[in-house]
Amino acid sequence: METGVAYFGNRILRHVQADLDDIVAHNCTYVVHTFSEEDQSYYAQTMGAIVKATHSAGLKAWIDPWGVGGVFGGEALSLYAARFPQRQQVLSTGETLPVACPNWPEFRAAMREWVDAALSTGADVLFWDEPHFAIPARFDWYNGASDAWACHCVACQYLYRERFGEELPAVHDTGVRAFRQERLLDFLADITGYAAVQGGRNALCLLPIADDDRHGLPWRAAAALPNVHIFGTDPYWFFTNLTPEEHVGQQTARAVELCRYIGKPTQIWVQAFSVPEGREDEIATAIEVAAAGGAEYIAAWGYDGCGHMSSIASARPEVVWDMIGRAYRRVRDA
């Protein structure tokens, strides 16, 4: 059983080292460090020192393309999307979003540069978090059509025409869904393959939604990619009407069944941000449900209940963090 936590928002090494000691004291075995475009540009060597300190603390170091291109999960903004508006994603309505389209060869080349930088830190695993086409509703400033979807850029139109022999429609239908899924799978195969050639290990986290959901990816096809070594999902139940037993239990069962079939370990993420006061004990329940369900890797997002990031801070981050440490000890001792 491997137990981890996401860590971000601090690049001052002596403070990171103190936090790493705290992470060890809370019964973690690995840390998922975010590595945004800003980190790649300005903190590359610093991140190498942070990864080295992580190893010195006896922890494994994972690294996450946090918000890179806007294609992966995370609050970090994308400089790439701002620099190259011609490669931004275009909605079916014709509006553009500040997100890069993974179908542009130039963006894929930029992702290979990210892989080079990430591996140069000495990280043990590259963590590909929630790869997706843009979801308009996630932008709090978006007030356009509720049924708009991405992407309808020049690259997507060309590739759709090549694939289906017709123009990319403005209405989202089964053909569009299949096209989007195929292209994201191709993108993931490309970047994980590039990393693996250089000796990198890849972990993939997909949203806990149905394969046929508009924003879903087929789990089996994604998990079975030859250079995906660990597969998981992030059933954050505070955003649902479900209990942790229900949501975490159902999604853990789904992921573990698949991973056992294809012979890969499972990772389950537990929500440790935006936790309401008085519900912190649900985190322990979620950890125990994931462990009992057979997940080999569990991780919490994020360190110290995300108390340092006001937009997603838990109401009582110190209680959240204490709950994680106690639950991790129990599942590791079981």
Residue ranges and their predicted role:
Residues 4-11, 32-41, 93-112, 170-185, ...:
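The substrate-binding groove and active-site-proximal loops of carbohydrate-active enzymes
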Residues 9-40, 120-125, 224-231, 289-298:
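Catalytic domains of carbohydrate-active enzymes, especially glycoside hydrolases
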Residues 62-121, 170-177, 189, 281-283:
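Active-site-adjacent "subsite" loops/lids of carbohydrate-active enzymes
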Residues 70-94, 129-167:
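Aromatic- and acidic-residue-enriched segments that line the glycan-binding/catalytic groove
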